């Protein structure tokens, strides 16, 4: 427990913060790495560490450093790589973005409005550094397009976007960053641009697909509400390292089971239910306790075979097909840092 920024509250508070790596697509998401962040006040306090049973090998690391380690571990475990999505608290960190590039991955990283970039010029002259907010305000009207990226619960989701090729301005001592895309959102009913992303994805990616990727974080935010409130991920009140991760592991396992069941068991309704063939009783079925005209001797008394124990004709839910690439769109689940 430490007084620090709490994303759920949007302000400073006494709380515990975890760095999470999830895999996600439009249908579901699932955390695959979950680690408690320990600030300096904890890592440098030996009595406090001992009381909370913090392993001696744990040293202070920033949240971006923990996130990068989680991505490396996922790749080492042969998790299918996808585009890395980050909110602004991670995406603004140039070291994390560069580390992702060195791993051979692409990212779509939300950034804050004060991040400096150099717009790419056709004459190859080196432009001055400018904040992404100032760059957005200076774009001509024809640079903006209204993009619809998906169907919402009540209406199509759309907003106004622009994209510009830029170089992220390096900090002192950093090498020049490669050319990438700055994506900007400026809803028509807002006085100024509201959101910014840096993306090193293929320049040939369609405008809509780029917006769709940037907006995929809604899946994580939506699922985290269920994880924290319905499953109880946010209910832990203990003070030990092991207890925190034990509670998180069980909560995530329970959530993984639930999203598997949602795929296996369709919602109630005549349209979906009619598609499910009801299992038929096997030939020769006899209710338990009914007289058997051909009673068996004691060694063969129980004639029920294990194959009759379950008559469900469903796929094994352990493979979680909702997180595999669909046939309609062969796209891997993306990495999302939370």
PLM feature segments, named:
Residues 258-294:
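Conserved nucleotidyltransferase catalytic core and NTase-mimicking acidic/glycine-rich helix/loop elements
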Residues 10, 24-60, 108-219, 314, ...:
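An anionic, glycine-rich sequence signature occurring as long contiguous blocks
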Residues 1, 6, 21, 83-90, ...:
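Short, conserved catalytic/metal-binding motifs centered on acidic residues
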Residues 1-21, 49, 115:
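Extended, low-complexity cationic-aromatic segments
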Residues 20, 248-261:
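Short, hydrophobic/amphipathic alpha-helical patches that form generic packing surfaces
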Residues 48-125:
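Domain-level cores of phosphate- or acyl-group-handling catalytic modules
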Residues 8-14, 238-249:
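Structural motif
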Residues 95, 199, 207-214, 229-246:
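Short, solvent-exposed helix-loop connector elements
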């Amino acid at each position: 427990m430490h007084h620090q920024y709490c994303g759920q509250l949007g302000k400073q508070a006494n709380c515990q913060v975890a760095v999470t790596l999830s895999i996600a697509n439009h249908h579901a998401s699932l955390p695959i790495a979950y680690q408690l962040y320990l600030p300096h006040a904890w890592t440098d306090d030996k009595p406090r560490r001992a009381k909370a049973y913090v392993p001696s090998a744990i040293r202070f690391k920033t949240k971006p450093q923990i996130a990068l380690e989680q991505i490396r571990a996922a790749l080492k475990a042969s998790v299918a790589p996808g585009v890395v999505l980050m909110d602004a608290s991670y995406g603004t960190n140039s070291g994390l973005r560069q580390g992702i590039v060195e791993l051979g991955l692409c990212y779509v990283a939300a950034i804050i409005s004060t991040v400096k970039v150099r717009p790419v010029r056709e004459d190859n002259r080196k432009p001055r550094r400018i904040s992404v907010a100032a760059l957005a305000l200076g774009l001509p009207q024809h640079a903006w397009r209204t993009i619809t990226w998906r169907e919402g619960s009540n209406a199509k989701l759309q907003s106004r976007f622009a994209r510009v090729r830029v170089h992220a301005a390096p900090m002192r001592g950093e090498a020049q960053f490669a050319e990438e895309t700055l994506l900007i959102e400026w809803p028509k009913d807002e006085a100024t641009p509201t959101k910014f992303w840096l993306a090193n994805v293929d320049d040939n990616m369609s405008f809509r697909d780029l917006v769709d990727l940037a907006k995929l974080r809604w899946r994580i935010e939506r699922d985290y509400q269920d994880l924290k409130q319905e499953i109880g991920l946010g209910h832990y009140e203990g003070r030990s390292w092991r207890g925190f991760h034990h509670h998180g592991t069980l909560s995530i396992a329970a959530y993984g089971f639930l999203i598997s069941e949602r795929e296996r068991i369709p919602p109630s309704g005549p349209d979906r239910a009619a598609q499910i063939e009801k299992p038929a009783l096997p030939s020769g079925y006899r209710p338990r306790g009914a007289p058997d005209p051909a009673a068996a001797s004691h060694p063969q008394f129980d004639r029920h075979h294990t194959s009759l124990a379950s008559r469900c004709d469903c796929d094994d839910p352990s493979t979680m097909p909702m997180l595999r690439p669909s046939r309609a769109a062969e796209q891997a689940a993306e990495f999302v840092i939370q």
